[in-house]
Amino acid sequence: KAKGKLDDFVITDEINACTIEIEVDVEGEKQDWYLLFKNETHNHPTEIEPFGGASTCVGGAIRDPLSGRAFVYQAMRVTGSADPRERIEDTLEGKLPQKKITKTAAKGYASYGNQIGLATSQIAEVYDPGYKAKRMEVGYVAGAVPKDWVRREAPLPGDRVIMVGGKTGRDGVGGASGSSKVQDETSINSLSAEVQKGDAVEERKIQRLFRKPEVTRLIKKCNDFGAGGVSVAIGEIADSLNINLDKLPTKYAGLNGTELAISES
């Protein structure tokens, strides 16, 4: 991009996934499509809550091209671990055993991918002593959508913001800043709640909804609901908004305003 060699690169203020314009042969007819790419690292979440961290690694990666109205059809997973055969008593204080992280993370990733129906065509796990200090969990996805299914316009006063997805809970509160905190031997006892509980079935419903051009063409601007919750996902939609947090559907009663505003779930 810096060298001006990406003539097909799509520039938009919807900064969700890298997008390029391509020509696709659809049963002999040439059509203009968008091809979207996204990768996501979930090193910290997977280390403290392996199942949820790995499952939301792929789920979170899907969200970005999906918010670009694309159908995500392919994935890749690259992970890094210390020797999973290491003796339990050699586990670093405040860490989960390498075997526990590796096996549980694999189950978490597979669980989400199977439920949403996403093919992961490349998987590689790298073993190195350096990953004992910090796990590596990288997910990558690709998606595509016909160009004429996507409408991009600036929001105007009077436009409505519609949230689509699961209900809000305390899981996912603090996830945006969690990986930047100072960690110690006790962190694992309290930080796992920062990892959002994934909902593959709900996300699959959104994928199916977005396969209808009569739906996608209604959308002026779309954003994925990531770390930082409402305050980020909706805050990035326009320069000035009125947000009524009481309107948010919740998993249970008792959430305060801050939790409603920043929960990733």
Residue ranges and their predicted role:
Residues 1-265:
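Glycine/proline-enriched, intrinsically flexible loops and inter-domain linkers
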